[in-house]
């Protein structure tokens, strides 16, 4: 783990509180583990023909069931997506404390001759469970509300941790018709906490033949009858894992894993719920699902972080792609900086923007770790350092704004915590003499190496090709798909086309009306010397300053809207220096910043007014304006825009507008678009997906009955 575990702010709950909130399902001995293993093996066997198996679990408990699902997955050609819903968020430190103080994940039991083989099997899997537990801890789950997507083994295993009120989490998700939940496991301590509405939301997300299993249901006839009746009323069949085996029955007691005769009336009720969802969010059209995982299915224009991570997310699903980059190398646009800060954008209200950036930052951080620990062959290492990010104010106004953020929420300490001036100095290893807000899991990453590593891994996993020095000048929609045109060549047709080309995002007729603006940024490169070279964390105030990498610090960045040129600017170089002087006045290390070499890099980032990236279907703006002539400024028009799918260019998608925080937001936005294109569950709630939609600026006004 990167952040120091001995900080008193990291663990706020003691062991007794933890075991009350996250109880073990049963005595974790050989008897229970054997039953659990048999049950989970049967689930995988029942769905062995599926390339992707979606499982749901209500409750985290002590984590044993989650780890056991992971361990039991044996089919190398099948991917697993496990969605775990837990009302009480927990972080890696508390999870480790829970496991450490309970001594073992699988408790030893007295030797019993008739159970010798089961006990031996349980002990054999103990080592594997411990390895998986450490892998999970290394992914740094944090105690935030919402979904955290954890991807392991190059996409073979994905775990979605949905923390927060279960009803809220379930109802916020969209149904995936191609890949619904096939089976649910409900931990017993949450059985009675599942209200009728939650059960119907589970049904909405489920396959028509999906079933439910729980543990210990048969021990209480009253609870059994009540629970079974409630779930049967939603179209489920319910089984008890404990019925799998006893000394007398062995392992032959059946557990229902597929509901072969679902009630037609109850299935209709589920469909009504799905239709209600679809109607309520009709203005936010989703991507058309790819029919087959062939390379010719999809083209991606762009060679930076967005296109690279979309390619990787598709490749993890077995989906090939053709990538077109106008430069001689990847990462030559906004992704070309030597170092970029990676940390979440937080708001006082912890609104959708703040929650998205927490999810996205953590996802991106895990991507860096995964590409570092299991790189592709001959992959260039990703230069990075998760040394934390220290945010401080630079004037009275910014201090008030920062104080509001700090005091606005009980932020999980693994996300950020306040430090006084003395602590800030100790973290930075240079004198700042002012308080701040420290993001312990943040740091810096080399963006172009990050993009290249993602592409290299994608090429290892799927049929991916990259065409460099290929400047796409025009795109055309034809009957059989999208055609891409250069000055001399023609590519396609492609069923799906994604524009992820950064500063050139608006260059085509189909995208030139996107409400997004280019901003020039000049990043100064200054030699590491004297006190300055001791800087040990990323500083963020009026501008940012990174620790040294290969003898240079990055200091930036200018922010010029719609720039006229991308040449070096001496004035912007001096402005970058002055920002540091304004942020940390009278500090002696400022004299160590030597700008005389005029060493800098200039790039353009595309920025949206609301700071969300753009991800989703490309809006057909001409058609929106045409429809607006017929439906405007009335109550009926608001209903029309609410319930009518917004006009889009079929098969064309946007992935961009990453702004200054693309390292944090880009990989998750790419993952969500890949999930849409492949018809898989998306790790974001419906409201956040609306915020990411490229049509949002127009639809926001139309849904309120305002003029465009």
UniProtKB/Swiss-Prot annotation:
Keyword Cytoplasm on entry: yes
Q: Which domain of life is it from?
A: Bacteria
Cofactors (names) = FAD
Region (FAD-dependent cmnm(5)s(2)U34 oxidoreductase) residue ranges read 301-708
The answer to whether the entry has keyword Transport is no
Q: Give EC number(s), comma-separated.
A: 2.1.1.61, 1.5.-.-
Task: Write down the PANTHER family for this protein, in alphabetical order.
Answer: SARCOSINE DEHYDROGENASE-RELATED (PTHR13847), TRNA 5-METHYLAMINOMETHYL-2-THIOURIDINE BIOSYNTHESIS BIFUNCTIONAL PROTEIN MNMC (PTHR13847:SF283)
**Organism expressing this protein natively:** Shewanella baltica (strain OS195)
Provide any one GO MF term from the record.
oxidoreductase activity, acting on the CH-NH group of donors
What SUPFAM superfamilies does the annotation carry? FAD/NAD(P)-binding domain
For biological process, the GO terms are: methylation; tRNA wobble uridine modification
The UniProt entry's sequence similarity note says: In the N-terminal section; belongs to the methyltransferase superfamily. tRNA (mnm(5)s(2)U34)-methyltransferase family.
Question: Annotated region tRNA (mnm(5)s(2)U34)-methyltransferase: where?
Answer: 1-278
Q: What is its main location?
A: cytoplasm
Q: What is this protein called?
A: tRNA 5-methylaminomethyl-2-thiouridine biosynthesis bifunctional protein MnmC
Q: Where in the cell is it found?
A: Cytoplasm
Q: What does this protein do?
A: Catalyzes the last two steps in the biosynthesis of 5-methylaminomethyl-2-thiouridine (mnm(5)s(2)U) at the wobble position (U34) in tRNA. Catalyzes the FAD-dependent demodification of cmnm(5)s(2)U34 to nm(5)s(2)U34, followed by the transfer of a methyl group from S-adenosyl-L-methionine to nm(5)s(2)U34, to form mnm(5)s(2)U34.
* Record key words, sorted: Cytoplasm, FAD, Flavoprotein, Methyltransferase, Multifunctional enzyme, Oxidoreductase, S-adenosyl-L-methionine, Transferase, tRNA processing
Sorted alphabetically, the Gene Ontology cellular component annotations on this record are: cytoplasm
């Amino acid at each position: 783990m990167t952040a120091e575990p001995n900080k008193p702010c990291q663990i706020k709950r003691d062991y007794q509180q933890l075991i009350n909130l996250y109880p073990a399902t049963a005595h974790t001995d050989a008897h229970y583990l054997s039953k659990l293993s048999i049950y989970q093996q049967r689930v995988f066997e029942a769905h062995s023909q599926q390339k992707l198996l979606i499982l749901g679990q209500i409750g985290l408990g002590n984590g044993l069931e989650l780890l056991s699902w992971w361990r039991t997955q044996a089919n190398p050609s099948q991917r697993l997506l496990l969605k775990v819903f837990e009302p009480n968020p927990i972080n890696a430190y508390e999870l480790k404390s829970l496991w450490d103080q309970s001594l073992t994940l699988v408790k030893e039991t007295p030797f019993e001759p008739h159970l010798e083989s089961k006990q031996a099997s349980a002990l054999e899997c103990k080592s594997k469970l411990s390895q998986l537990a450490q892998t999970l801890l290394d992914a740094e789950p944090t105690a935030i509300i919402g979904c955290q997507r954890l991807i392991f083994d190059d996409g073979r295993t994905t775990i979605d941790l949905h923390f927060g009120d279960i009803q809220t989490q379930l109802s916020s998700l969209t149904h995936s018709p191609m890949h619904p939940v096939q089976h649910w496991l409900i931990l017993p301590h949450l059985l009675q906490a599942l209200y009728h509405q939650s059960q119907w939301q589970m049904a909405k997300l489920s396959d028509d033949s999906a079933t439910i299993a729980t543990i210990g249901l048969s021990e209480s006839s009253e609870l059994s009858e009540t629970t079974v009746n409630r779930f049967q009323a939603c179209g489920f069949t319910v089984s008890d894992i404990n019925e799998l085996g006893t000394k007398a029955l062995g392992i032959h007691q059946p557990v229902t894993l597929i509901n072969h005769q679902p009630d037609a009336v109850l299935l209709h009720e589920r469909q009504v719920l799905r239709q209600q969802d679809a109607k309520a969010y009709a203005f936010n059209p989703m991507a058309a699902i790819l029919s087959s995982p062939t390379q010719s299915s999809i083209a991606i224009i762009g060679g930076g972080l967005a296109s690279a991570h979309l390619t990787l997310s598709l490749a993890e699903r077995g989906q090939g792609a053709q990538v077109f980059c106008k430069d001689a190398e990847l990462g030559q646009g906004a992704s070309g900086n030597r170092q970029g800060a990676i940390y979440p954008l937080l708001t006082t209200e912890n609104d959708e923007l703040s929650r998205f950036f927490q999810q996205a930052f953590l996802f991106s951080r895990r991507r860096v770790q995964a590409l570092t620990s299991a790189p592709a062959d001959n992959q260039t290492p990703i230069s990075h350092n998760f040394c934390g990010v220290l945010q401080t104010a630079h004037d009275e106004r910014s201090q008030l704004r920062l104080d509001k953020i700090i005091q606005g929420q009980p932020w999980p300490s693994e996300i950020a915590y306040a430090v006084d001036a003395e602590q800030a100095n100790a973290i930075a290893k240079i004198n700042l003499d002012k308080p701040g807000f420290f993001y312990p899991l943040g740091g810096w990453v080399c963006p172009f190496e990050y993009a290249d590593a993602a592409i290299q891994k994608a090429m290892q996993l799927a049929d991916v090709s990259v065409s460099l020095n290929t400047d796409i000048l025009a795109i055309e929609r034809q009957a059989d798909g999208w055609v891409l045109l250069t000055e001399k060549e023609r590519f396609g047709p492609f069923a799906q086309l994604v524009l992820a080309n950064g500063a050139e995002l608006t260059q085509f007729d189909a995208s030139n009306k996107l409400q997004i603006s280019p901003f020039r940024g000049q990043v100064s490169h200054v030699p590491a010397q004297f006190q300055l070279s001791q800087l040990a964390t990323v500083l963020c105030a009026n501008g940012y300053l990174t620790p040294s990498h290969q003898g240079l610090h990055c200091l930036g960045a200018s922010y010029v809207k719609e720039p006229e040129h991308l040449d070096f600017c001496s004035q912007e170089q001096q402005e970058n220096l002055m920002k540091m002087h304004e942020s940390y006045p009278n500090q002696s290390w400022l004299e160590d910043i030597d700008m005389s070499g005029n060493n800098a890099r200039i790039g353009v980032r595309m920025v949206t007014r609301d700071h969300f990236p753009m991800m989703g279907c490309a809006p057909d703006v001409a058609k929106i304006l045409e429809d607006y002539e017929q439906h405007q400024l009335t109550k009926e028009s608001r209903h029309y825009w609410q319930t009518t799918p917004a006009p889009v260019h079929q098969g064309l998608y946007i992935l961009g507008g990453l702004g200054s925080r693309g390292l944090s937001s880009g990989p998750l936005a790419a993952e969500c678009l890949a999930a849409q294109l492949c018809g898989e569950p998306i790790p974001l709630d419906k409201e956040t997906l609306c915020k990411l939609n490229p049509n949002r600026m127009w639809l926001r006004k139309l849904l309120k009955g305002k003029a465009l």
